UniProtKB/Swiss-Prot annotation:
Organism: Ligilactobacillus salivarius (strain UCC118)
SUPFAM superfamilies per the UniProt record, alphabetical: YheA/YmcA-like
Superkingdom: Bacteria
Similarity-based family: Belongs to the UPF0342 family.
UniProt xrefs under InterPro entries: Com_YlbF (IPR010368), YheA/YmcA-like_dom_sf (IPR023378)
Protein name: UPF0342 protein LSL_0473
Length: 114
């Protein structure tokens, strides 16, 4: 009998070996090594976290949205931040593809058109 946990653990190991993961890991190290970029990175992550918390609570504050837009614009002035966002998009595509594969059996179970 197949143990899906063994498969999942192997997937985790394979993900760590993927080029997308290695690229992301490398650019995060560069961001952390550059004080100015890392400061903007932390500001952006904090603003994103605040926005996400408010969305979950259903209490979206316009000031938080505006602040996030301003910080995002500031971050776009830093080449390393732009590289980071590019690498985040690449790994996000990979993870989305993996999710589609993983959830395919469930999609088939609930498919009302088939």
């Amino acid at each position: 009998m197949i143990n899906v946990y063994d498969t999942a653990n192997q997937l985790e190991k394979d993900l760590r070996e993927s080029q997308e993961y290695k690229d992301l890991q490398a650019v995060v190290a560069k961001v952390k090594a550059d004080d100015a970029t890392f400061a903007v990175y932390k500001k952006l992550r904090e603003a994103q976290k605040t926005l996400q918390e408010q969305q979950m609570q259903g209490t979206l504050d316009e000031k938080v949205m505006k602040s996030l837009q301003e910080i995002s614009q500031e971050a776009s002035q830093y080449p390393l931040m732009m590289e980071l966002m590019e690498k985040e998009r690449a790994i996000s595509v990979l993870i989305d593809d993996l999710n589609k594969i993983i959830f395919k059996p469930l999609s088939e179970v609930y498919d009302i058109e088939g």
